[in-house]
Design a protein with these regions (language model features):
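Non-catalytic helical/linker scaffolds that mediate oligomerization, partner binding
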Residues: 1-436
């Protein structure tokens, strides 16, 4: 890991307090936005583009192909109106386990959400029941004691007595009042039910809940049949730029996704491996080598790891991606801006430190999916990124990267030598852009 900031003594207080007047200049660190109900109109997408969105993320954990296609058409119109280009990312559902609180299509989160939240009480029994058939889902009744799991037929086989289960609102923001921890008491294989004890009080809101099961490891596939269908019939069809491969566990998961893309001549589409489970960490080096980029999903990863371990794993993964020359993306940043116009001081510092750690892009989830301040969030994150970049020691970082590459791979390749020469020349003349 390398020193990436200038010496504090060399910066000077006057420079720190200097007002940044370059509001029209975009940050070098890119901003990825998850598009949802509140941000999918042409008007809102135009605001996101003008605020600094670089990549639009289409999350296939919910919504039909027709729904996402309509959103994509709106994005293209917004790009035409603003004359600002934007890449597209398809995020697979992967092995995510879900609970629906309403039978309707979850494309319209607010409209279909139950009017009153489910009240969870510590010590109460909760039954998780497999409910995979469409007819059963239409007739299901959800209560604080009964949760239907809609997309995991093998639930009873992958859990064990004593396992911890976390349930939170889709793209949960970490609030202890809107998520619940359960402990598995017994498993009824015949009736496909798991009986649990609730460990905390909570108010469960929204239409879609996600379920995180401890020790699940590689028991569920990274790419389901639905994921393959989404990639081929929507991603390839619409020429997406990136695939976000949810719950990547190994390099083979990436290779499988690449084979699907290659079979359909989608050679340009890049694959970003999403690190969401602790089990993926033992394969992190081979995943980085195989993927085009890595997304550190701190939300899901944080439910499986002690909080004090997340920061050092972030620094380690970002550093290894930088040395390997792979895209490094950090998720879960300014959760409070889903409901507030400003981030907390801790969140603002977290964003800046992500930039200084070497993140190439920052991924916004609930803030732009269902948040009330989507474009304001993008503008704020971009401002923090730009401020952090003012004090980023690019030259020292560059020299450290070259040295590290020589240590790990011997002499640099011809392509790397050409690229490094271009960077040196650009730095010396103060170039704003390098055109390849």
């Amino acid at each position: 890991m390398f020193q990436r900031t200038e010496s504090i003594d060399d910066i000077g207080l006057s420079r720190i307090l200097q007002t940044d007047k370059s509001n029209t200049i975009s940050s070098l660190t890119k901003v990825i936005c998850t598009i949802g109900v509140k941000s999918r109109t042409v008007e809102e997408l135009s605001k996101l583009l003008e605020a600094g969105m670089s990549v639009a993320r289409f999350d296939f954990s919910w919504g039909s192909h027709e729904y996402h296609t309509e959103t994509l058409m709106n994005l293209r119109q917004a790009m035409k109106n603003t004359k600002i280009l934007c890449a597209t990312m398809l995020d697979t559902c992967g092995s995510e386990v879900a609970v629906r609180l309403a039978a309707e299509d979850v494309s319209s989160f607010d409209k279909d959400a139950p009017k009153t939240p489910l009240v969870m009480k510590e010590g109460n029994k909760v039954v998780l029941s497999v409910c995979n058939h469409e007819e059963d889902q239409k007739n299901m009744v959800v209560t604080s004691e009964f949760f239907p799991v809609v997309n995991c037929d093998s639930l009873c086989e992958i859990v064990s007595v004593g396992d911890s289960i976390f349930i939170g609102q889709y793209l949960f923001t970490g609030s202890e009042t809107s998520s619940v921890y359960l402990t598995v008491d017994s498993i009824d294989i015949e009736n496909k039910q798991v009986v649990c004890t609730c460990n905390n009080d909570a108010l469960m809101r929204g239409v879609l809940l996600t379920v995180q099961i401890s020790n699940i490891g590689e028991k569920l596939p990274t790419l389901s049949r639905n994921d393959e269908h989404d990639i081929v019939n929507w991603g390839v069809k619409n020429n997406v730029d990136f695939i976000s491969l949810s719950f990547t566990n190994s390099a083979e998961d990436v290779r499988k996704c690449r084979r699907i893309l290659d079979e359909h001549k989608s050679f340009h589409t890049k694959i970003c491996a999403k690190i969401e489970r602790a089990s993926a960490l033992k394969n992190i080096d081979e995943i980085i080598e195989e993927a085009d980029g890595v997304i550190i999903s701190r939300g899901n990863l944080g439910t499986e790891l002690p909080p004090e371990k997340v920061f050092i794993l972030q620094k380690m993964i970002l550093s290894r991606c930088n040395v390997a020359g792979k895209h490094a993306i950090v998720a879960r940043l300014v959760d409070t801006m889903a409901e507030a116009p400003r981030p907390t001081r801790a969140e603002a510092t977290d964003v800046a430190n992500g930039v200084l750690d070497g993140a190439d892009a920052l991924l916004l989830g609930a803030e732009t999916l269902r948040g009330n301040f989507a474009s304001e969030t993008v503008a704020m994150v971009r401002k923090i990124c730009r401020e952090a970049e003012r004090f980023y020691d690019h030259e020292s970082f560059y020299n450290a990267q070259i040295s590290q590459r020589k240590i790990e791979a011997g002499e640099v390749s011809q392509a790397e030598a050409l690229a490094s020469s271009a960077v040196r020349a650009g730095t010396k003349v103060g170039a704003k852009l390098i055109v390849v």
